[in-house]
Swiss-Prot record:
Subcellular location: Cytoplasm
Listed name of the protein: Proteasome subunit beta 2
GO molecular function, one term: endopeptidase activity
Family to which this protein belongs: Belongs to the peptidase T1B family.
Enzyme Commission numbers on file: 3.4.25.1
Organism in which the protein naturally occurs: Thermococcus kodakarensis (strain ATCC BAA-918 / JCM 12380 / KOD1) (Pyrococcus kodakaraensis (strain KOD1))
CDD domains: proteasome_beta_archeal (cd03764)
Principal cellular location given in the protein's record: cytoplasm
Recorded name of the encoding gene: psmB2
Any single GO BP term: proteasome-mediated ubiquitin-dependent protein catabolic process
Length: 199
């Protein structure tokens, strides 16, 4: 019998940068394993990915991307852009389509320009202004579609991202709604925070 897991991660791109947000609950079937897991992983000081799917697969991909980013920096003397990293990850996923990494990833970063992309397990790549992944994504994307504006500030995007994850957590039993991990990436760098709710 298959065990059900789930999560919700979202990303929003603005003119000022990128906001990534995710719940912090790890679940396995009907059991909550922890309420304190990080689902947004930094790859460089300007690029991060969100995790939905197999934790081991995402961790392996994150290690590959970190190594590729360091190699790129060493070879070319400049950081890899988030767009280039998204294309690289798309190729890695597509090369493994017969034995796929069971992941759905959002990649966000600010190297030269704010970039946000969504990747499916087979390497399908979509660049967008906002996106959501995981079992709660249908609920989160509805909130994002309703609240997104092209001219929104990073602070407004952060509030919208938290609201989207929290809404998903209220409707999707596999998404937590008590704590939201938020990563904001701008030209000034990357900042992480956790937004907690008592109820």
């Amino acid at each position: 019998m298959e065990k059900k897991t789930g999560t919700t991660t979202v990303g929003i791109r603005t003119k000022e940068g990128v906001v990534l947000a995710a719940d912090t609950q790890a679940s396995l079937d009907h059991m909550v394993e922890t309420l304190n897991i990080r689902k947004i992983l930094p790859i460089t000081d300007r690029i991060a990915i969100t995790t939905a799917g197999s934790v081991g697969d995402v961790q392996a991909l994150a290690r590959m991307l970190e190594a590729e980013a360091r190699y790129y920096q060493f070879t070319w003397g400049r950081p890899m852009t988030a767009k280039a990293m998204a294309h690289l990850l798309s190729n890695i996923l597509n090369e493994n389509k017969w034995f796929p990494y069971m992941v759905q990833i959002i990649i966000g970063g600010y190297v030269e320009e704010p970039t946000l992309a969504n990747l499916d397990p087979l390497g399908g790549l979509i660049f967008d202004d906002y996106t959501a992944t995981g079992s709660g994504s249908p609920f989160a994307i509805a909130v994002l579609e309703d609240g997104f504006r092209k001219d929104m500030s990073l602070e407004e995007a952060k509030e919208l991202a938290v609201r989207a994850v929290r809404t998903a957590g209220k409707r999707d039993v596999y998404t937590g709604d008590r704590k939201v991990q938020v990563v904001v990436i701008s030209k000034d760098g990357m900042k992480e925070e956790f937004v907690e709710f008592k109820e």
